[in-house]
Protein backbone atom coordinates (compact mmCIF):
# COMPACT_ATOMS: atom_id res chain seq x y z
CA UNK A 1 0.00 0.00 0.00
CA UNK A 2 1.25 3.45 -0.89
CA UNK A 3 -0.14 6.80 0.28
CA UNK A 4 -1.95 5.53 3.34
CA UNK A 5 -4.42 8.20 4.35
CA UNK A 6 -7.80 6.72 5.29
CA UNK A 7 -8.42 5.23 8.75
CA UNK A 8 -9.58 2.00 7.12
CA UNK A 9 -6.25 1.72 5.28
CA UNK A 10 -4.29 2.22 8.49
CA UNK A 11 -6.39 -0.44 10.23
CA UNK A 12 -5.78 -2.85 7.36
CA UNK A 13 -2.05 -2.11 7.43
CA UNK A 14 -1.87 -2.83 11.17
CA UNK A 15 -3.72 -6.12 10.62
CA UNK A 16 -1.24 -7.15 7.91
CA UNK A 17 1.73 -6.18 10.08
CA UNK A 18 0.36 -8.25 12.98
CA UNK A 19 0.43 -11.37 10.78
CA UNK A 20 3.95 -12.71 11.15
CA UNK A 21 3.26 -15.64 8.79
CA UNK A 22 3.92 -13.46 5.74
CA UNK A 23 6.66 -11.02 4.77
CA UNK A 24 5.26 -7.57 4.02
CA UNK A 25 6.45 -5.31 1.20
CA UNK A 26 6.35 -1.83 2.70
CA UNK A 27 5.55 0.89 0.18
CA UNK A 28 4.83 3.49 2.84
CA UNK A 29 7.14 4.37 5.72
CA UNK A 30 4.29 3.84 8.21
CA UNK A 31 4.49 0.12 7.38
CA UNK A 32 8.23 0.17 8.06
CA UNK A 33 7.52 1.70 11.47
CA UNK A 34 4.85 -0.89 12.38
CA UNK A 35 7.02 -3.80 11.23
CA UNK A 36 10.22 -2.61 12.91
CA UNK A 37 8.33 -2.08 16.19
CA UNK A 38 7.19 -5.71 15.94
CA UNK A 39 10.71 -6.82 14.97
CA UNK A 40 9.37 -8.40 11.79
CA UNK A 41 11.50 -8.63 8.64
CA UNK A 42 10.15 -6.68 5.67
CA UNK A 43 10.72 -5.71 2.05
CA UNK A 44 11.22 -2.04 1.13
CA UNK A 45 9.14 -1.54 -2.03
CA UNK A 46 9.90 0.72 -4.97
CA UNK A 47 7.33 3.32 -3.83
CA UNK A 48 9.54 4.28 -0.88
CA UNK A 49 12.07 5.74 -3.37
CA UNK A 50 15.32 4.80 -1.69
CA UNK A 51 18.20 6.34 -3.66
CA UNK A 52 21.34 6.03 -1.52
CA UNK A 53 23.23 3.38 0.47
CA UNK A 54 22.96 5.31 3.75
CA UNK A 55 19.17 5.13 3.62
CA UNK A 56 19.35 1.44 2.79
CA UNK A 57 21.54 0.96 5.86
CA UNK A 58 18.89 2.59 8.04
CA UNK A 59 16.25 0.25 6.61
CA UNK A 60 18.53 -2.79 7.08
CA UNK A 61 19.03 -1.78 10.72
CA UNK A 62 15.22 -1.63 11.10
CA UNK A 63 14.74 -5.14 9.67
CA UNK A 64 14.72 -4.87 5.87
CA UNK A 65 15.60 -8.18 4.18
CA UNK A 66 14.89 -7.20 0.56
CA UNK A 67 14.94 -3.94 -1.38
CA UNK A 68 12.99 -3.28 -4.58
CA UNK A 69 14.92 -0.88 -6.80
CA UNK A 70 12.92 2.12 -8.09
CA UNK A 71 11.84 1.40 -11.68
CA UNK A 72 13.18 4.64 -13.14
CA UNK A 73 16.82 3.97 -12.30
CA UNK A 74 19.50 2.45 -14.54
CA UNK A 75 21.79 -0.55 -14.39
CA UNK A 76 24.78 1.73 -13.76
CA UNK A 77 22.97 3.40 -10.88
CA UNK A 78 22.23 -0.03 -9.36
CA UNK A 79 25.88 -1.08 -9.63
CA UNK A 80 26.98 2.15 -7.89
CA UNK A 81 24.33 1.71 -5.20
CA UNK A 82 25.42 -1.85 -4.45
CA UNK A 83 29.09 -0.84 -4.42
CA UNK A 84 28.18 1.78 -1.82
CA UNK A 85 26.42 -0.91 0.21
CA UNK A 86 29.60 -3.03 0.04
CA UNK A 87 31.57 -0.07 1.41
CA UNK A 88 29.09 0.25 4.30
CA UNK A 89 29.36 -3.49 5.00
CA UNK A 90 25.64 -4.18 4.52
CA UNK A 91 25.47 -5.74 1.06
CA UNK A 92 25.19 -9.31 2.36
CA UNK A 93 22.28 -8.42 4.67
CA UNK A 94 19.54 -7.96 2.04
CA UNK A 95 18.30 -9.20 -1.33
CA UNK A 96 17.68 -6.97 -4.34
CA UNK A 97 14.61 -7.12 -6.57
CA UNK A 98 14.60 -5.46 -9.99
CA UNK A 99 11.41 -4.95 -12.00
CA UNK A 100 12.10 -6.49 -15.37
CA UNK A 101 8.71 -6.67 -17.04
CA UNK A 102 5.26 -5.15 -16.67
CA UNK A 103 3.54 -1.80 -16.59
CA UNK A 104 5.79 0.74 -14.91
CA UNK A 105 4.30 2.55 -11.91
CA UNK A 106 4.49 6.28 -12.69
CA UNK A 107 2.49 8.01 -9.95
CA UNK A 108 0.19 7.49 -6.98
CA UNK A 109 -2.91 9.49 -6.20
CA UNK A 110 -4.83 10.10 -3.00
CA UNK A 111 -7.97 9.28 -5.03
CA UNK A 112 -8.82 5.86 -6.38
CA UNK A 113 -9.38 6.19 -10.12
CA UNK A 114 -11.30 2.92 -10.33
CA UNK A 115 -13.72 3.79 -7.53
CA UNK A 116 -14.19 7.30 -8.89
CA UNK A 117 -14.98 5.96 -12.38
CA UNK A 118 -17.85 4.04 -10.79
CA UNK A 119 -19.01 6.96 -8.61
CA UNK A 120 -17.90 5.25 -5.39
CA UNK A 121 -16.02 6.65 -2.42
CA UNK A 122 -12.53 5.26 -1.87
CA UNK A 123 -13.50 3.87 1.57
CA UNK A 124 -16.73 2.36 0.23
CA UNK A 125 -15.57 1.04 -3.12
CA UNK A 126 -16.86 -2.54 -2.72
CA UNK A 127 -13.58 -3.65 -4.35
CA UNK A 128 -14.79 -2.54 -7.77
CA UNK A 129 -11.17 -2.83 -8.97
CA UNK A 130 -11.64 -6.61 -9.09
CA UNK A 131 -13.70 -6.04 -12.25
CA UNK A 132 -10.55 -4.68 -13.91
CA UNK A 133 -7.64 -7.04 -13.10
CA UNK A 134 -5.44 -5.32 -15.70
CA UNK A 135 -6.50 -1.79 -14.75
CA UNK A 136 -8.32 0.68 -16.99
CA UNK A 137 -6.54 1.65 -20.18
CA UNK A 138 -6.58 5.28 -21.31
CA UNK A 139 -5.84 6.08 -24.93
CA UNK A 140 -4.76 9.14 -26.88
CA UNK A 141 -7.06 10.66 -29.50
CA UNK A 142 -5.13 8.59 -32.04
CA UNK A 143 -6.03 5.39 -30.16
CA UNK A 144 -2.57 4.73 -28.70
CA UNK A 145 -2.23 3.37 -25.17
CA UNK A 146 -1.13 6.20 -22.86
CA UNK A 147 -1.72 5.11 -19.26
CA UNK A 148 -3.24 2.29 -17.28
CA UNK A 149 -5.18 3.51 -14.26
CA UNK A 150 -5.22 0.85 -11.56
CA UNK A 151 -6.72 1.92 -8.24
CA UNK A 152 -4.60 4.81 -6.95
CA UNK A 153 -1.76 4.04 -9.35
CA UNK A 154 -1.03 5.52 -12.77
CA UNK A 155 1.02 3.06 -14.81
CA UNK A 156 2.66 3.14 -18.22
CA UNK A 157 0.23 2.43 -21.05
CA UNK A 158 2.38 -0.30 -22.54
CA UNK A 159 4.83 -2.88 -21.33
CA UNK A 160 8.46 -2.09 -22.19
CA UNK A 161 9.80 -4.48 -24.82
CA UNK A 162 13.30 -4.96 -23.46
CA UNK A 163 13.96 -7.12 -20.44
CA UNK A 164 17.22 -6.58 -18.61
CA UNK A 165 18.37 -9.37 -16.32
CA UNK A 166 20.92 -9.02 -13.53
CA UNK A 167 22.70 -11.81 -11.71
CA UNK A 168 25.12 -11.92 -8.83
CA UNK A 169 28.45 -13.27 -10.02
CA UNK A 170 31.47 -13.48 -7.67
CA UNK A 171 30.23 -10.58 -5.58
CA UNK A 172 29.37 -8.30 -8.54
CA UNK A 173 26.12 -7.59 -10.34
CA UNK A 174 26.45 -8.13 -14.09
CA UNK A 175 24.15 -7.52 -17.01
CA UNK A 176 23.10 -10.76 -18.70
CA UNK A 177 20.58 -9.63 -21.32
Where does each model-flagged region fall?
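Active-site pocket-lining/capping segments in soluble small-molecule metabolic enzymes
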Residues: 1-50, 54, 73-177
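Conserved glycine-bearing catalytic or ligand-binding loops at nucleotide- and phosphate-handling centers
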Residues: 66
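Conserved functional loop/turn residues at catalytic and ligand-binding sites
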Residues: 63
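Short beta-strand and adjacent tight-turn residues that come in two discontinuous sequence segments
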Residues: 69
